[in-house]
């Protein structure tokens, strides 16, 4: 029984087939949204750290609830993800969120948890994109056009002395 369970989670195709044919992602986002009723902005923005952004469906559904609670306040999201396929899916969702919430900043990284926790971003490469336009369609086009730039800079290698994943640097 243990081997079968392990095989299920080790096979990306089997896992994706399951999560994409159920409403688990929506249920997770709706459950998280319940905590917003007691949430307050304590500094300059409402901040979210998503420690496994995946394809973006959970965070984007949650962002619609955050917008409902804080419609004018700044929202800053830092998402961690290493899969370029998931990043491309995430970009497809984000145009609607940026259109709905004009004060949204979304940062996606493949830094390790240790680097994030220790604020060690010496090898960090920043790609900044300010969206222009007045429709979610226009925002989606701009985000989807970033795919190649991200792909060129998202390549990761595993350092043999640690588990830290580093973005490929162009010299």
What are the residue ranges of the model-derived segments?
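Class I SAM-dependent methyltransferase Rossmann-like catalytic core
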Residues: 1-43
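Class I S-adenosyl-L-methionine-dependent methyltransferase module
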Residues: 41, 61-171
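Residues that form or flank phosphate/diphosphate-binding pockets in enzymes
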Residues: 27, 57, 88
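Conserved class I S-adenosyl-L-methionine
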Residues: 43-57, 77-78
């Amino acid at each position: 029984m243990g081997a079968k369970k392990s095989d299920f989670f080790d096979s990306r195709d089997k896992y994706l087939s399951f999560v994409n044919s159920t409403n688990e992602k929506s249920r997770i986002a709706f459950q998280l949204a319940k905590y917003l009723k007691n949430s307050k902005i304590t500094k300059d923005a409402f901040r979210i750290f998503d420690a496994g952004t995946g394809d973006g469906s959970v965070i984007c559904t949650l962002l619609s609830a955050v917008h409902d609670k804080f419609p004018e306040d700044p929202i800053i999201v830092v998402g961690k993800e290493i899969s370029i396929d998931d990043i491309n899916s995430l970009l497809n969702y984000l145009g609607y969120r940026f259109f709905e919430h004009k004060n949204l900043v979304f940062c996606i990284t493949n830094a390790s948890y240790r680097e994030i926790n220790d604020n060690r971003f010496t090898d960090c490469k920043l790609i900044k994109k300010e969206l222009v336009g007045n429709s979610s369609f226009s925002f989606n086009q701009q985000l989807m056009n970033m795919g190649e730039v991200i792909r060129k800079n998202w390549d990761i290698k595993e350092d043999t002395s640690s588990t830290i994943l580093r973005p490929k640097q162009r010299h």
